[in-house]
Amino acid sequence: MGKGGGYVTVAAEEVEELRRRNGELEREMEEMKKEMVQLWRRTVVAEEAEERLCSQLAELEVESLDQARDYHSRIVFLMDQISRLSSSSLEVVVTNS
């Protein structure tokens, strides 16, 4: 075999190496596709959870605002009663004097 035969052998070895490497890359690509699908599914689950949490937070904000308004009304009512009782007490003291 001359130089020509040597080149054919090297080329055949290179082709075989390229085929082997191509197979490895295809397997890696399939694995990456699987990982990407898993990540996408996890992202969808996380987005749905975020939406539920935002909805719950909005409900809690409304509830806390309602409670704050109720407490404020109660405080105003009690302050008014205290004021009236104080005024009544002063009137009793003045009339008894």
Swiss-Prot record:
Protein name (Swiss-Prot/TrEMBL): Protein RESPONSE TO LOW SULFUR 3
InterPro entries recorded: LSU
Domain of life of the source: Eukaryota
Coiled coil region boundaries: 8-42
Gene Ontology terms: biological process: cellular oxidant detoxification
Keyword vocabulary terms for this entry: Coiled coil
